[in-house]
Amino acid sequence: MLKMETVDKVDMIKNHGLTASENLEKFLKRIEAKNDDINAFLEVRGEEAIKRAEEIDARIASGKETGKLAGLVIGVKSNINVEDFNVSAASKTLENYTGSYDATVIRRIKEEDGIIIGMTNMDEFAAGSSTETSFFGPTDNPAAPGRIPGGSSGGSAAAVAAGMCDLALGSDTGGSIRNPASHCGVMGFKPTYGAVSRQGLLDLAMSFDQIGPLAADVSGISLALDVISGYDPADPTTLDSSPDLEVERELKGLRVGVVREFLEVTDEAIDEVIQGKLGAMEDEGAEIVELDFGYIDLCLPTYYLINYVEFFSATRKYDGRKYGHRIEDVCGSEVLRRIHMGSYISQKELSGKYYKRALQARSLIRREITGLLSHVDIIAGPTVPKLPHTLGEELEPMEMYAYDVLTVIANLAGIPAASIPAGDVGGVPVGLQLQAKPGDDGMIVSAMREIASL
């Protein structure tokens, strides 16, 4: 059952070939057997999920309409509000905070009969790339045991990779969906900025953050995007129209940009896997177009300067007065460092020296990457330039940040991007990143569908 295409499973549930309760039961057993070792889920609400599945089954049995996600089991990153669930952001700051409402994406999932099974682990307040900074302990990588699953949505990626749910939601600020998708050998999608409502998300950096799905197959990504995308009056950053996910393009004639600088910063073993996948695409008729990107060295400093300032602003509400603890009193070292850096940069006398220059650099990067995309249909390359390290291995901050060098570009530019499995290096998964013009989310989904069949 776990290998069944997600869209086929929905059809099977709707047509009496499988009940929502049976689907849920297998995932609950899987979670019970595996989660103590993997630590993908921080909270599982089995009883509520069982009631929800029974309601869906009763409606199907009586011939009533059911939604696009009927009976699918979904995990949710712990920084997205779900009513009556623990929304901790994997921090002691909010360890006992219970969501009082559903985020827009959760409401839409429930309206389409998706079943929320629980909250997944993550880096504390999404500030990390390994899911090791969680107050509740690290998450293991089911696809490469003993290594990090990536982050910050590592629990969501691990849950999908371990077969604990059909779909999972993550948030992506600088690669936090795509990075763990790559490391765990699953698919992850960061939508165009504004395509999906952020209402109900605990922000890391509001001008970068996007909620998106992780899944084991392309149909799961497409189904989830179809449900969660669209204008939301509660989030003024959302776009008026949803992306067209019905795009169908064969690889034959598809213009695929390959950026030389992206490959130059990538480990040789990963590069070989990526080149193999690009070669397979070319064999199917894709046109490979070599491109140059002149601002690769600007991307990480630009991203982190803006990230620090926006994160500092976002964390001022965690003062311990209304709920939880004062963040500076209980948070981990990475969160505290980002707060201190954001405070320093935000000081009036320094804003022109760092933050304003970072905004100018962001404009340069956005113009450069969108300019390159005007010549091709998609840009393809490695998602992450190096393999995931061993759990517990000590890395300097800049070594950790290096995981993000190829993923932050999409967040700086607001463009859609995804990671799809490309192969492995010694059994460790490697992801192929696809990027497209703003609003061309459907082009990426179409390309993912074609690449997955190679």
Swiss-Prot record:
Q: What is its EC number?
A: 6.3.5.7
Cite the entry's keywords alphabetically.
Answer: ATP-binding, Ligase, Nucleotide-binding, Protein biosynthesis
The secretion signal range is none
Tell me, which GO biological process terms does this entry list? translation
User: So what does this thing catalyse?
Assistant: L-glutamyl-tRNA(Gln) + L-glutamine + ATP + H2O = L-glutaminyl-tRNA(Gln) + L-glutamate + ADP + phosphate + H(+)
A Gene Ontology cellular component where this protein is annotated is: glutamyl-tRNA(Gln) amidotransferase complex
- One Gene Ontology molecular-function label: ATP binding
Q: Which InterPro entries match?
A: Amidase, Amidase_CS, Amidase_dom, AS_sf, GatA
Highest taxon of the lineage: Archaea
What is the active site of this protein? K77 (charge relay system), S152 (charge relay system), S176 (acyl-ester intermediate)
- NCBIfam families assigned to the protein according to its UniProt record, in alphabetical order: gatA
Q: What does this protein do?
A: Allows the formation of correctly charged Gln-tRNA(Gln) through the transamidation of misacylated Glu-tRNA(Gln) in organisms which lack glutaminyl-tRNA synthetase. The reaction takes place in the presence of glutamine and ATP through an activated gamma-phospho-Glu-tRNA(Gln).
Q: How does it assemble?
A: Heterotrimer of A, B and C subunits.
PANTHER family on file = GLUTAMYL-TRNA(GLN) AMIDOTRANSFERASE SUBUNIT A, MITOCHONDRIAL, TRANSAMIDASE
Q: Which family does it belong to?
A: Belongs to the amidase family. GatA subfamily.
- Write down what this protein is called: Glutamyl-tRNA(Gln) amidotransferase subunit A
